[in-house]
């Protein structure tokens, strides 16, 4: 009891010297803890006469209260200083411009479709569209594709029933257009098509674009000239191009078109040919008066060749690291 004032003074000095909340808590334990200096003063009350104990206890409690108030005040100071330091470190410079929201970009396949539509639009072609759920007449029969052709098999085509299917080509758009209007006809038909195939260079759904001209005096020379100009415009270089004889039921003669790659090898890019007379007859156009040419190409294939992509499936995986390269 005799040195109570000294203990309070010592505690206040230690409190004022505490540099953080942890050090301050150590001071609290030293003086007010279960075995703290001031707490132990209560044990001296038993040495006093009973009538003096209440007054002495009140003095000890007052001393403890002074120390507790000093602890609370110092804790508030330390917490305020810590907050101010954190705010100073996190100060926002309001004069800095905000972070710009990153702009999106067109998918590389969409860029290819737009580029091709722009080129053929300048040649007078219009864009035609048609249903993706097609019937076997427009997808096969009208295109001179016989019933035994392997393209009709389940392993190549997605059938709903005996006559309804997911279109395997956009050629059905050509049939619908020729039935709806008389020549001259000059269209391109971009769109999604579906085939039962999946590997590094094939997916069950992909994009195709077909072109069609029907008019008088249309020749294979017109076809070659149009595709020569298109390929050199699309790849933006003076490519070596060759036409190889091929077979398609809906064109005669038919050809496949190759370009010379940077590795010195020929790369197939599209198929084409003169519209088969049977196809013209199927839509009520006289093949003795009119002729035409058609061509078809895969958009993913051309996009892969233009940008050097090796796996077609990358176009459908929505990986932003891949897609951002084409912005």
Swiss-Prot record:
Necessary cofactors = Mg(2+)
Question: Where is it mostly found?
Answer: cytoplasm
Subcellular location field: Cytoplasm
- Molecular function per GO: ATP binding; magnesium ion binding; phenylalanine-tRNA ligase activity; tRNA binding
BP-aspect Gene Ontology terms: phenylalanyl-tRNA aminoacylation
A cellular-component GO term for this protein: cytoplasm
Q: How does it assemble?
A: Tetramer of two alpha and two beta subunits.
Q: Which PANTHER family match?
A: PHENYLALANINE--TRNA LIGASE, MITOCHONDRIAL (PTHR11538:SF41), PHENYLALANYL-TRNA SYNTHETASE (PTHR11538)
Q: What is this protein called?
A: Phenylalanine--tRNA ligase alpha subunit
Query: What organism, scientifically named, is this protein from?
Result: Escherichia coli (strain 55989 / EAEC)
Gene from which this protein is expressed: pheS
């Amino acid at each position: 009891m005799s040195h109570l004032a000294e203990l309070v003074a010592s505690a206040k000095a230690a409190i004022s010297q505490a540099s953080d909340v942890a050090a301050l808590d150590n001071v609290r334990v030293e003086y007010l803890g279960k075995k703290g200096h001031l707490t132990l003063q209560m044990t001296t009350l038993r040495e006093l006469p009973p009538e003096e104990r209440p007054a002495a206890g009140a003095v000890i409690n007052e001393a403890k209260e002074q120390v507790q108030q000093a602890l609370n005040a110092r804790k508030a100071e330390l917490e305020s200083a810590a907050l101010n330091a954190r705010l100073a470190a996190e100060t926002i410079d309001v004069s800095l411009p905000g972070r710009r929201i990153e702009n999106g970009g067109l998918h590389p396949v969409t860029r290819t479709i737009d580029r091709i539509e722009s080129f053929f639009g300048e040649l007078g072609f219009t864009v035609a569209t048609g249903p993706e759920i097609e019937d076997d007449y427009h997808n096969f029969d009208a295109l001179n594709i016989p019933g035994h052709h392997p393209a009709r098999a389940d392993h190549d085509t997605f059938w709903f029933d005996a006559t309804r299917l997911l279109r395997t080509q956009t050629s059905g758009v050509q049939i619908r257009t020729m039935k709806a209007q008389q020549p001259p006809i000059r269209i391109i038909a971009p769109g999604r098509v579906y085939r039962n195939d999946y590997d590094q260079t094939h997916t069950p759904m992909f994009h195709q674009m077909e072109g069609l001209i029907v008019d008088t005096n249309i020749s294979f020379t017109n076809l070659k000239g149009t595709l020569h100009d298109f390929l050199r415009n699309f790849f933006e270089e003076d490519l070596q191009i060759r036409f190889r004889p091929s077979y398609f039921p809906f064109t005669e003669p038919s050809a496949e078109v190759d370009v010379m790659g940077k590795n010195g090898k020929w790369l197939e890019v599209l198929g084409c040919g003169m519209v088969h007379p049977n196809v013209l007859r199927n839509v009520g156009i006289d093949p003795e008066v009119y002729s035409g040419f058609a061509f078809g190409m895969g958009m993913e294939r051309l996009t892969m060749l233009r940008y050097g992509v090796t796996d077609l499936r990358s176009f459908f995986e929505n990986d932003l690291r891949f897609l951002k390269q084409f912005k």
